[in-house]
């Protein structure tokens, strides 16, 4: 049994991790049987495919294999890259793995656009089961769904930590409801239980050939959100998520079996979950519909928070441009809000709703990004286990990667039917990452960085002979061994020397969390070096660190790059740099003390 604290953590993970996969029963079977006839044999075969997809891709790939590869408790695609890169000897392999991580991140973010759209639309479409609303137009459904999405995204800037405590209990109620509903339906058609045998899944694929192969592209919808188990491991811990998954898995399997049993009895049904609930307890249908809408909102909220987290991780690992970040909680430092991401997501979600109009059509675009992410996770896991000489797990991981790729290939047919949208979104994000990272490397090479030894020689000479300004000046530098051009301009070209000069270097460590601050030895009179070593998931409050160190700065200098180029790619990079907040804006340093020093670069 659980202790009280363990129980609370398990319930909490229900609300923050399992919203997406938990609301999949609303639309998964309904969409599958648009592709294939609901005969008795087909229903049993599809149910078997769903059960074994949940076992292989979620339980084995994520709950067992991926979650055994955490780094200081943190999970996700970037973490897999951080684990794998030190194991590789070839720089070519490192570049390939880095590209894979970028593609995986892009797919994950592309998938995030579709999740709220399909979840909210599918729940609101349940209104049609109510007799008074059976003729409600699709435009009204879209309007209601859009209003819910707008309301959800509009409250993000206020912070949602005050209400997140209710997410867990609501999702526990959701899973209990769909689980018991499934049991009630199975009671009347117990033969569906034979779908637990994988023989029926294999037989369905063999009997149906190419159609069976394409059905896999919709079966994968039952596992969307499975990647959240690993991605959210750092926030909630491995054990609570695994314990919660046992309950969630049971509820999902029971509900899918129940829907299959209902479909055997009612082959003319079109919206299986809602019609099953309505038939079982008509008086409770409206409360259930409201519960389903709230569950999809919770699923969407988890995606939004996850997106903020992924983008922040990308910013701190320098693969995504800096964006304005607000902290929405004085208690939970991980509660952040990124306005650019929030409003771009809302526009994208509304666009998806307007373009596809129905959840069943939106399913045509869903799954491609998910299977892409799963395949990349499988490849990286297999490589890690192989390099660690864990041959058993490497072979199991290789088999699962093969299954992932089969699902990915089955989703290729979706590309001309709307799947191209998820590809376009992922390619846009990937292009942004590649242009930004390549531009930063190119820019760094163009910088006339001064070796520390040469700088100190000149500094000592200038400091001894020049008049000094009273007070303390701060200078930011990435590498204390190679001094940026702007510092040389300030001190040697403009002859601006303060009594006390402090170089601040913020170094991102390989670990996700932890902040260490220390002054290194004083290299010269009037010059100190402050190193801030922070985990790549840490939110660094530089102003607080300066106060804690007793630094009363008078002026903060920072470099500004002015890029001149005729190359179209570098022009895009230049625009990205111009619209992105500067280093000092990102860290929210006091504006009245800031002095930007511009240096022009021709790329």
Swiss-Prot record:
Source superkingdom: Archaea
Membrane topology: Multi-pass membrane protein
Pfam families tied to this protein: K_trans (PF02705), K_trans_C (PF22776)
GO cellular component terms listed in the entry, alphabetical order: plasma membrane
Parts of the chain that traverse the membrane: 15-35, 43-63, 94-114, 135-155, 163-183, 209-229, 244-264, 283-303, 336-356, 365-385, 390-410, 415-435
Keyword match Transferase: no
Principal subcellular localisation of the protein: membrane
Catalytic reaction equation(s): K(+)(in) + H(+)(in) = K(+)(out) + H(+)(out)
Protein keywords: Cell membrane, Ion transport, Membrane, Potassium, Potassium transport, Symport, Transmembrane, Transmembrane helix, Transport
Single GO MF annotation: symporter activity
Subcellular location: Cell membrane
PANTHER family for the chain: K+ POTASSIUM TRANSPORTER, OSMOTIC STRESS POTASSIUM TRANSPORTER
HAMAP family, alphabetized: Kup
Function: Transport of potassium into the cell. Likely operates as a K(+):H(+) symporter.
Similarity section: Belongs to the HAK/KUP transporter (TC 2.A.72) family.
Annotated protein name in UniProt: Probable potassium transport system protein Kup
Gene field: kup
């Amino acid at each position: 049994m659980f202790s009280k604290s363990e129980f609370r953590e398990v319930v909490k993970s229900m609300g923050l991790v399992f919203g997406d996969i938990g609301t999949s029963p609303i639309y998964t079977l309904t969409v599958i049987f648009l592709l294939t006839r609901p005969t008795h044999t087909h229903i049993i075969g599809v149910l078997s495919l769903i059960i074994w997809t949940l076992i292989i891709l979620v339980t084995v790939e994520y709950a067992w294999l991926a979650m055994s590869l955490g780094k200081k408790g943190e999970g996700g695609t970037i973490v897999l890259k951080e684990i794998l890169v030190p194991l590789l000897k070839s720089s070519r392999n490192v570049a390939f793995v880095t590209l894979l991580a970028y593609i995986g991140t892009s797919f994950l973010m592309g998938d995030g656009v579709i999740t709220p759209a399909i979840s909210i639309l599918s729940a609101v479409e349940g209104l049609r089961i109510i007799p008074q609303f059976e003729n409600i137009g699709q435009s009204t459904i879209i309007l209601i769904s859009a209003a819910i999405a707008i309301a959800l995204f509009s409250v993000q800037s206020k912070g949602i930590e005050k209400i997140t405590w209710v997410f867990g209990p609501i999702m526990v109620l959701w899973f209990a409801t769909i689980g018991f509903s499934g049991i009630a339906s199975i009671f009347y058609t117990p033969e569906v239980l034979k779908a637990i045998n994988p023989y029926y899944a294999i037989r369905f694929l063999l009997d149906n050939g190419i159609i069976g192969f394409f059905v896999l592209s919709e079966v994968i919808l039952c596992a969307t959100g499975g990647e959240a188990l690993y991605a959210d491991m750092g926030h909630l811990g491995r054990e609570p998520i695994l314990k919660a998954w046992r309950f969630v898995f049971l509820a999902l399997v029971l509900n899918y079996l129940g829907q299959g049993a209902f479909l055997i009895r009612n082959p003319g049904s079109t919206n299986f979950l809602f019609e099953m609930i309505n038939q079982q307890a008509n008086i409770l249908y409206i409360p259930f519909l409201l519960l389903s809408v709230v569950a999809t909102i919770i699923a969407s909220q988890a995606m939004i928070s996850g997106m903020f987290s992924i983008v922040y991780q990308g910013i701190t690992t320098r693969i995504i441009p800096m964006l304005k970040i607000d902290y929405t909680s004085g208690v939970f430092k991980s509660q952040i809000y990124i306005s650019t991401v929030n409003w771009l997501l809302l526009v994208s979600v509304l666009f998806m709703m307007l373009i596809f109009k129905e959840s069943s059509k939106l399913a045509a675009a869903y799954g491609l990004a998910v299977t892409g992410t799963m395949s990349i996770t499988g490849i990286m896991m297999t490589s890690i286990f192989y390099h660690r000489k864990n041959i058993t797990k490497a072979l199991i991981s290789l088999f699962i990667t093969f299954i992932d790729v089969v699902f990915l290939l089955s989703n290729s047919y979706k590309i001309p039917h709307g799947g191209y949208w998820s590809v376009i979104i992922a390619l846009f994000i990937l292009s942004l990452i590649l242009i930004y990272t390549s531009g930063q490397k190119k820019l760094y090479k163009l910088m006339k960085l001064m070796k520390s030894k040469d700088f100190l020689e000149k500094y000592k000479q200038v400091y001894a002979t020049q008049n000094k300004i009273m007070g303390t000046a701060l200078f930011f530098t990435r590498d204390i061994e190679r001094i940026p051009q702007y510092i040389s301009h300030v001190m040697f070209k403009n002859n601006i020397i303060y009594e006390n000069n402090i170089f601040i270097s913020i170094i991102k460590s390989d670990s996700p969390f932890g902040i260490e601050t220390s002054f290194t030895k004083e290299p010269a009179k009037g010059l100190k070096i402050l190193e801030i070593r922070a985990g790549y998931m840490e939110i660094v409050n530089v102003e607080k660190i300066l106060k804690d160190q007793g630094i009363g700065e008078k002026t903060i200098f920072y470099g500004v790059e002015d890029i001149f180029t005729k190359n179209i790619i570098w022009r895009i990079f230049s625009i990205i740099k111009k619209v992105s907040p500067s280093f000092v804006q990102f860290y929210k340093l006091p504006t009245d003390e800031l002095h930007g020093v511009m240096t022009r670069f021709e790329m």
